[in-house]
Amino acid sequence: MADRRNRCNQILLLAYQSFGLVFGDLSISPLYVYKCTFYGGLRHHQTEDTIFGAFSLIFWTITLLSLIKYMVFVLSADDNGEGGIFALYALLCRHARFSLLPNQQAADEEISTYYGPGDASRNLPSSAFKSLIERNKRSKTALLVLVLVGTSMVITIGVLTPAISVSSSIDGLVAKTSLKHSTVVMIACALLVGLFVLQHRGTNKVAFLFAPIMILWLLIIATAGVYNIVTWNPSVYKALSPYYIYVFFRDTGIDGWLSLGGILLCITGTEAIFAELGQFTATSIRFAFCCVVYPCLVLQYMGQAAFLSKNFSALPSSFYSSIPDPFFWPVLMMAMLAAMVASQAVIFATFSIVKQCYALGCFPRVKIVHKPRWVLGQIYIPEINWVVMILTLAVTICFRDTRHIAFAFGLACMTLAFVTTWLMPLIINFVWNRNIVFSVLFILFFGTIELIFVASALVKIPKGGWITLLLSLFFTFITYVWHYGSRKKYLCDQHNKVPMKSILSLGPSLGIIKVPGMGLIYTELASGVPATFKHFLTNLPAFYQVVVFVCCKTVPIPYVPQKERYLIGRIGPKTYRMYRCIIRAGYKDVNKDGDDFEDELVMSIAEFIQLESEGYGGSNTDRSIDGRLAVVKASNKFGTRLSRSISEANIAGSSRSQTTVTNSKSPALLKLRAEYEQELPRLSMRRMFQFRPMDTKFRQPQVKEELFDLVNAKDAEVAYIVGHGHVKAKRNSVFVKQLVVNVAYSFLRKNCRSPGVMLNIPHICLIKVGMNYYL
């Protein structure tokens, strides 16, 4: 009984919190739906039946798409609790070979969160349809492009939502005051600038206000709706019957169909409900929507319909005109607050989708900021923040009329919903293992409805929808070009990797001079020796005594448990002292800015050495072989092989180095000193600990010797070697490929964050190796 009560309390708490982050965009739609619906030819059909028909369309659109499609079906297609367009794609990539990146390993499937509980789909034989997609590269490319189009629509919505939300919330000032429309636009721009400028500070100090603001807003609009129903037309409840939809199209004809571009605005923000699923639970979101959001919105739209059925002249400003005069200013203030909350949630969703896109190799490297005091999962991306702000201001100033912004907004939201509708049948068939008949029925029912709305929205392209096409094409081009270039570069690395025979033929010394220290060679290859290593030895025939090839890769799951992130293996015989470390992360994982990476790496390698000597064959050992890589996961004994103590020698050495540089008068050395002092705190933290093998008896003396070599190498010096590539298309490539690789992809590589910054590598420990790539 106590557990059941605790579960209920948890659901209620999450449902309460979801109002501030999930339902903001959907809840402010009443500000502009009727205004945009009765635009164009429909203004000439000002009858009660037309008003009732518009409300009936709104009611059934919310019911069929928001309530049934999303609450019943789409929310069930979560990826370990995460939602969004990339969650669906990741699910498909795990249950079928749909990914175009060839760096997936069998060991990835052994992650505890890779498959859901009770998931038996991996043991089922592949269907003919599934095998057809897996074998056909064009089908997989088409699926990826579909996902990237959906991703681009999310970013476009991130541009348009703040513009239409803030502008619509203060539109009432034009009708109620003598302010000019240009003045109202400037007020909206000022609010938008303030919203984006404060993004870098996070929302942890004000996030507790979001839910109360949205709940109060929903109660206000529901109360206003009830007031208008009782005051103006109590018989409006009859419009709940779909019969009025028939009457609507019978009386309005083509004008009624064109007005669907305004009707569809009633479900804008529904996709955000699914995208923000990871912050809450499907049960809590369903509870909040069905018990509060849905009835409040229906009452508000019904109330506006009752008011408009007796006041046709109020159509251009239907929402604020339906508010009683004594409550106008309080409602205006609440509308502005609700618009800011809704905009904040969409901006956060934009950061999140860009992070996921980058993690899965579909977006250029950008700075991702997460501070410990922020809400779990909250991130900030400076480049995206300023680009979205500039685009939002440009849309607000250029369009001025919120109806034109709304038409662009509606096209983006409906296209995103349409993409989800096309992905869901694949989920039903491949992930849920339901009969293909259910997939066909799903896409026929919901796809037909949404196709009608999309067709109506496309007609609005000259009246504002063109901005959606322009932005979505721009972002789709960027994401696909980056994915294409990254995939070609990976395949080039894979083709040019050094054969193991040539490494083994060099002997333990590798034919070079070995110096004390540890060299970490970063590569995208999950197997084999990268050409970067050979290129380095060719130009400088000396290297560190311990070599570790580090591969940071993203697995198509939201989060990888910390104890399962490091996969350690050996390259060549033990005397070579060459290891491989594969660091796996989920597409929602945020890299910590901590300085314990070197310590974790040394501990992991030491664990691998000991487990290898013990012939450990328990459940923690992955017996799969990736080339010459034996993948071993951390055991329960992890961290017990080495002891750690504070190194006074390194601290003293740092002080001596600083004194030497300070006394120098060389401008070059003084400049180097400035960079060194900037990195000194981080470097000191990385070097302040020394490792020593535990006082245990080793069955094999070679194990103790190898552990001492590992520890001494770490204490001596750790250097990070990263390839610095120059990418060009092959001379015999077609013109389009040369344009994409030599111009677009090269431009993105030169103007995005460097790998060293993304990997949190200290600048003074970084060595870049130049490489030429001909794709």
From Swiss-Prot:
InterPro entries from the UniProt entry: K+_transporter (IPR003855), K_trans_C (IPR053952), K_trans_N (IPR053951)
Location of the protein in the cell: Cell membrane
Cytoplasmic side: 1-10, 76-143, 199-205, 275-286, 349-378, 429-435, 485-775
Modified residues (Phosphoserine): S647
Membrane topology: Multi-pass membrane protein
Tissue and organ expression note: Detected at very low levels in roots, stems, leaves and flowers of mature plants.
Pfam family, one: K_trans
Membrane-spanning intervals of the chain: 11-31, 55-75, 144-164, 178-198, 206-226, 254-274, 287-307, 328-348, 379-399, 408-428, 436-456, 464-484
Residue ranges, Extracellular side: 32-54, 165-177, 227-253, 308-327, 400-407, 457-463
Predominant subcellular localization, coarse grouping: membrane
Effects seen without this gene: Loss-of-function mutation results in the arrest of root hair growth.
Domain of life: Eukaryota
GO biological process: cell tip growth; cotyledon development
Keywords: Cell membrane, Ion transport, Membrane, Phosphoprotein, Potassium, Potassium transport, Transmembrane, Transmembrane helix, Transport
A GO CC term attached to the entry: plant-type vacuole
Keyword Phosphoprotein found: yes
GO molecular function: potassium ion transmembrane transporter activity
NCBIfam families attached to this UniProt entry: kup
Family recorded in the similarity comment: Belongs to the HAK/KUP transporter (TC 2.A.72.3) family.
Purpose: High-affinity potassium transporter required for tip growth of root hairs.
Protein name: Potassium transporter 3
